[in-house]
């Protein structure tokens, strides 16, 4: 938490419980974290209604999963739909078949996300999200490479329990732009 040009900014970095044991079985753990985070957000928004809030990190759920949509109340549209408190600018990136920040069993997921409070989307605030600036950083050096089906996947630092000298992570990083008005 801090201020930028007198506007309050709260950054909340997340790493939610994994899907170990299966998505359905593990979902209650992520919903519980979403509820705890929701209480923190509600408290901040009550005391600072115009605060800019960025929730970011590895949510271990995709943009359309229950923990994000119902737990955090993050939607894909702006202006925000009724009942939503955050915009998820990552949502359109997940609509592309070969896009995501990680793969599991050959399927792309977008667990690494930014969720933005309404105040970051309004033009009158000092700090503003630059529309359509979110992206997944996927340089070739971070990809498996080659000709096989895994060529576009992240080059892991640890694979099957062994350190890979040329590896990076099992997730690609994400970024976005903010501007000061």
Report each predicted region and the residues it spans.
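Active-site metal-binding loops of divalent metal-dependent hydrolases
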Residues: 16, 58-59
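Beta-strand-turn-beta hairpins that frame and shape the catalytic cleft
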Residues: 1-20, 180-181
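Second-shell loop/turn segments in exported
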Residues: 20-30, 55-56, 99-102, 162-163
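A compositional/structural signature marking long, glycine- and acidic/polar-rich segments
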Residues: 16, 26, 38-42
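His/acidic metal-ligating clusters that form di-metal
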Residues: 33-56
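Metal-dependent phosphoester-hydrolase catalytic domains
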Residues: 45-51, 61-181
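Alpha-helical membrane segments in multi-pass integral membrane proteins
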Residues: 8-9, 30-33
């Amino acid at each position: 938490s801090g201020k930028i040009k007198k506007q309050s900014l709260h950054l909340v970095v997340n790493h939610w419980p994994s899907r170990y044991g299966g998505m359905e079985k593990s979902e209650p753990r992520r919903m519980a974290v979403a509820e705890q985070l929701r209480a923190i957000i509600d408290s901040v928004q009550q005391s600072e209604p115009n605060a800019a809030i960025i929730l970011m990190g590895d949510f271990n759920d995709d943009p359309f999963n229950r923990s994000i949509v119902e737990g955090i109340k993050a939607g894909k549209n702006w202006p925000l739909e009724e009942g939503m408190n955050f915009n998820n600018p990552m949502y359109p990136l997940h609509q592309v078949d070969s896009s995501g920040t990680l793969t599991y069993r050959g399927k792309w997921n977008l667990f690494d996300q930014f969720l933005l409070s309404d105040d970051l989307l309004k033009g009158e605030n000092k700090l503003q999200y630059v529309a359509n600036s979110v992206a997944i950083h996927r340089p070739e050096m971070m990809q498996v490479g080659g000709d096989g089906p895994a060529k576009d996947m992240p080059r892991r630092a640890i694979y099957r329990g062994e350190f890979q000298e040329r590896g990076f992570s099992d997730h690609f990083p994400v970024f976005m732009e903010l501007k000061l008005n």
